[in-house]
């Protein structure tokens, strides 16, 4: 069994599979992904594989520079997105946007 390259909370699985979530915002520990990378995706909770994605773009961002477009790509409101990122990465301000598509 191959290991997963990246994981998402289970609550995001349906949005990823339906194409409603097309970016993920990560901290420095996951800043190594590059455009063109093909990644096996698993659920954070049980590491169960659920799809393969291709990275289509990467960029850096701060909490203060998040926009409505980022929120739309995450399938949530900007207020929700800022709260989710702050809850997952407390005290951090520099992040990495990974844009992707399901294969």
UniProtKB/Swiss-Prot annotation:
<comment type="function">
    <text>Catalyzes the hydrolysis of N(4)-acetylcytidine (ac4C).</text>
</comment>
<feature type="active site" description="Proton acceptor">
    <location>
        <position position="21"/>
    </location>
</feature>
<feature type="domain" description="ASCH">
    <location>
        <begin position="6"/>
        <end position="101"/>
    </location>
</feature>
<dbReference type="InterPro" id="IPR015947">
    <property type="entry name" value="PUA-like_sf"/>
</dbReference>
<comment type="similarity">
    <text>Belongs to the N(4)-acetylcytidine amidohydrolase family.</text>
</comment>
<dbReference type="GO" id="GO:0016813">
    <property type="term" value="F:hydrolase activity, acting on carbon-nitrogen (but not peptide) bonds, in linear amidines"/>
</dbReference>
<dbReference type="InterPro" id="IPR008314">
    <property type="entry name" value="AC4CH"/>
</dbReference>
<dbReference type="GO" id="GO:0005829">
    <property type="term" value="C:cytosol"/>
</dbReference>
<feature type="active site" description="Proton donor">
    <location>
        <position position="74"/>
    </location>
</feature>
<dbReference type="GO" id="GO:0106251">
    <property type="term" value="F:N4-acetylcytidine amidohydrolase activity"/>
</dbReference>
<protein>
    <recommendedName>
        <fullName>N(4)-acetylcytidine amidohydrolase</fullName>
        <ecNumber>3.5.1.135</ecNumber>
    </recommendedName>
</protein>
<dbReference type="InterPro" id="IPR007374">
    <property type="entry name" value="ASCH_domain"/>
</dbReference>
<dbReference type="Pfam" id="PF04266">
    <property type="entry name" value="ASCH"/>
</dbReference>
<feature type="active site" description="Nucleophile">
    <location>
        <position position="24"/>
    </location>
</feature>
<keyword id="KW-0378">Hydrolase</keyword>
